[in-house]
Each structure stands twice: as structure tokens, then as C-alpha cells.
């Protein structure tokens, strides 16, 4: 799932939310790449033909961190997502101190929703402006129409999934 570069890679969303690092090894070298930089385009990665993925690493969230993984599909199992979101957040006294997102099936690659992260990091969960959150999601995703869903519905889903996660922090 990680190396195929699929924009619908549900499991990869968690790696994005956790800010994972992918370690690649070739015949005479080893290098590490943030998972958010691992994908170079639709179904393409920065992995060279002579490299293997040998490790995926990430820092575990602190105990009590909020975490979610949501997949919306036509069926309950074995369905390619209309949209999927993984999110992790740590708070201290209501202030978001760490947050990460991974969004699938809303662009040509899995997205970290960096604009949403920048918007909410360091903010009090009770003072988040959900209209601003929606605008940040809207500005970053690029969903398409295909046999599974419309781009319009995917856009709506991602806004709802992100807002529900952030509202649950309060």
C-alpha cells in the first residue's frame, strides 16, 4: 500500500498523521524521507529502482492523545474509499500542541492537510473557527469525479471528517 503510490491508500493516512519517516536502502546507501515527501505524483514515489523500503518510523503519540481513522466507502469492507482521514492531536490545557492529518482519495496523492495543521496548531480547541477550517480544507484538496464518487461529495466528506475530529477535541 505504501509503495504503490495510490491516492486511495487508506493505511498510509495514519503514517501521514503520525509524521512518519520512510527509510530506503540501496546497494550502497540508506536514506530517510518524510512520508509527506515520499510521493512525487499520482502512483509515483521518490523510491529509486535499486531501493527497498526497509523501515517506517514515527514517534508514538502521548498517552491520551486524540486519534481517529475514518473511511467512507460504498461497502463496509474491501471497498476503495470515497474519502479517508486519519488524524492525531495532543493537547495541553486545551491548546493543540501536536496535530497531524492524512487525507486519502481527495487528490492525486495522500495529503497531510498542511494548511489545516498550520491553522489549528497552537490554538485553543474551544476557539477554533470551523469556517476557517473548512476554507483550509477546501484550499488544499483536489478531489475528482470517478466511478466511486463525485469530487463535490468528497470535498463535503473531508470537511465533515476534519471538523468532527477537531470538535471532538473540545
Predicted regions and their residues:
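C-terminal structural segment of proteins
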Residues: 1-170
Amino acid at each position: 500500500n505504501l509503495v504503490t503510490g495510490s491516492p486511495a491508500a487508506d493505511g498510509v493516512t495514519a503514517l501521514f498523521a503520525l509524521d512518519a519517516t520512510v527509510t530506503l536502502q540501496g546497494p550502497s546507501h540508506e536514506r530517510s524521507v518524510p512520508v509527506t515527501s515520499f510521493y512525487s505524483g499520482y502512483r509515483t514515489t521518490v523510491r529509486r529502482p535499486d531501493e527497498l523500503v526497509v523501515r517506517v518510523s514515527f514517534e508514538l503519540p502521548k498517552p491520551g492523545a486524540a486519534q481517529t481513522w475514518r473511511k467512507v466507502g460504498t461497502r463496509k469492507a474491501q471497498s476503495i474509499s470515497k474519502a479517508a482521514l486519519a488524524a492525531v492531536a495532543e493537547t495541553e490545557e486545551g491548546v493543540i500542541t501536536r496535530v497531524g492529518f492524512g487525507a486519502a482519495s481527495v487528490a492525486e496523492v495522500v495529503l497531510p492537510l498542511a494548511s489545516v495543521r498550520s491553522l489549528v496548531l497552537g490554538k485553543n480547541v474551544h476557539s477554533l473557527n470551523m469556517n476557517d477550517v473548512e476554507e483550509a480544507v477546501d484550499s488544499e484538496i483536489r478531489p475528482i469525479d470517478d466511478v466511486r464518487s463525485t469530487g463535490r461529495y468528497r470535498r463535503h466528506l473531508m470537511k465533515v471528517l476534519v471538523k468532527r475530529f477537531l470538535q471532538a477535541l473540545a
